[in-house]
């Protein structure tokens, strides 16, 4: 197709493959199945959840989608709004707004280009939060700093300029800016390190510091490998630590914290089973259904479920993204 790179063509080709239903049926034996016996595609990205229906030419009531592509900056923005309970059930996500910013250049060491993407991110944050007036903002860096693919949140905190203590001490005299937001940050770690739920730590900090808004930053899981380290998702529904890899914890949401919560994430891992799906669909296209089932039963290890894959250069990429 015109305007698509070879990877995109390959992905579209295999997703329309006749081998796909058989692959998901067999993967479902090892990877957690739903009522239909099909494999649950694990993704934190609302845009990927929406694409499941698009591929089947199904419109979901209560889900609105807007797409925009900035050709000059090579930035694609997709806004998914879930407006009804029906839409939330179909998408498997809470009602709210999900903004996805995609760009091939995100994983490259280009500071000027990252600045342009940051401006786009800032624009959407202002729309969701409203930063025209001074606000107190708590940034929560979720994830395990000892695991590279999960260290995005802590890395972001390390790169931020905190201002809450300066404002409390000196007021606006500490800056020449007319508007200065009180920024504070915390890296709550993971339960295996602290013995506490992330939500418990954040709830305590929120109760004492009383921010106007909480922004939680976390590494996510994607369905499609081409979105790894090239996509930013912003949502006003908050975030659930560990949900991308199946470690469900109490969510950081407005309902739990009694303050507006914005979730920001970048997918850094993909479920290994989806890679098998993409590879096998192309390989097995020439086999009939019975041969496909026999081959997959022999080849797919039951230990595949729960395994996640990340790019080999993720350590450098995390530095750029943060």
Model feature map: region roles:
Residues 186-187, 216-322:
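A structural signal for small-residue-enriched, beta-sheet-centric alpha/beta enzyme cores
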Residues 112-174:
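N-terminal active-site beta-alpha-beta segment that forms phosphate/nucleotide-binding
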Residues 176-205:
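A structural-propensity feature for long, helix-poor, extended segments
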Residues 87-129:
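An N-terminal, well-structured beta->alpha segment
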């Amino acid at each position: 197709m015109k305007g698509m790179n070879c990877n995109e063509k390959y992905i579209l080709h295999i997703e329309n493959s006749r081998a796909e239903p058989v692959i998901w049926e067999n993967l479902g034996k090892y990877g957690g199945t739903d009522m239909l016996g099909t494999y649950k595609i694990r993704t934190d990205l609302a845009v990927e959840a929406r694409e499941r229906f698009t591929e089947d030419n199904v419109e979901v009531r209560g889900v609105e989608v807007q797409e925009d592509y900035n050709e000059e900056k090579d930035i694609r923005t997709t806004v998914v709004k879930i407006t009804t309970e029906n839409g939330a059930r179909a998408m498997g996500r809470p009602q709210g707004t999900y903004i996805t910013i995609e760009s091939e250049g995100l994983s490259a060491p280009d500071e000027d280009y990252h600045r342009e993407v940051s401006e786009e991110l800032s624009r959407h944050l202002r729309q969701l939060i409203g930063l025209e007036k001074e606000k107190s903002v708590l940034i929560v860096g979720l994830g395990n700093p000892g695991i590279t693919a999960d260290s995005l949140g802590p890395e972001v905190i390390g790169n931020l300029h905190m201002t809450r203590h300066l404002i409390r001490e000196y007021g606006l005299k500490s800056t020449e800016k007319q508007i200065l937001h009180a920024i504070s940050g915390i890296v709550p770690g993971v339960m295996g390190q602290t013995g506490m739920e992330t939500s418990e730590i954040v709830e305590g900090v929120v109760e004492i510091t009383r921010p106007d808004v909480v922004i939680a930053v976390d590494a996510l899981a994607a369905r499609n490998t081409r979105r790894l380290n090239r996509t930013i998702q912003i949502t006003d529904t908050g975030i659930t630590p560990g949900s991308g890899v199946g470690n469900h914890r109490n969510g950081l949401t407005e309902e739990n914290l009694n303050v507006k919560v914005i979730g920001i994430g970048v997918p850094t891992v993909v479920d290994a089973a989806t890679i098998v799906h993409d590879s096998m669909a192309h390989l097995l296209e020439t086999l009939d259904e019975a041969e496909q089932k026999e081959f997959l039963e022999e080849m797919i290890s039951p230990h595949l479920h729960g395994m996640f894959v990340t790019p080999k250069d993720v350590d450098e990429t995390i530095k750029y993204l943060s």
